[in-house]
Amino acid sequence: VEYRPSEKYTIENTTMNPFETKSVTFAEPIEMLYACHGKVRRFCGQVAMLSDYIAENGCNQIVLQTIRQIAQYFNVAAPLHHEDEEENFFPLLLQYAPQAQESVNELLRQHVSLHGNWDAVAAEFAKLEADNAYVPDAEAFKRFVAGYDVHLAIEEPLFDMGKTFIPKEKLTEIGEIMAARRRR
């Protein structure tokens, strides 16, 4: 996610349903992982805009609604997504494409730092909710977005590798596991 101030994005136009999947189902688990990344990009775009928006408009209802949606995604869906990768996709990928081991190891390390970056952003969100005059730490927001920029650039080529090397029936199996994870 690269935030370009010249683009005409506004926080008002980017609120979204965090569970929208554009007709992708767990029958296509790699497409579902990509769909999650689409949400991550959109939410990171919102996080990237927050500091400037708040400086210009204050912490209004739009900001509060936006941070609640972002928090819902990163508190609920993102940990499930990481679990899908760590417990299902990465191990299966390594069975069929062991050359991905170095990238998988790096991504697993990054999952830890991404969670830490989220904790810092969530703390800023909590302060904003408690005190609408609070000025959030823009650096925490930048670290969060930058962490995902790097992460997605390494991870998505592995999704393509999975499409190439993992048999369809194995993908179907992990898709069922991923769907069941969300029903528990």
Would you name each region that the model predicts?
Residues 3-184:
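Small-residue-biased structural context
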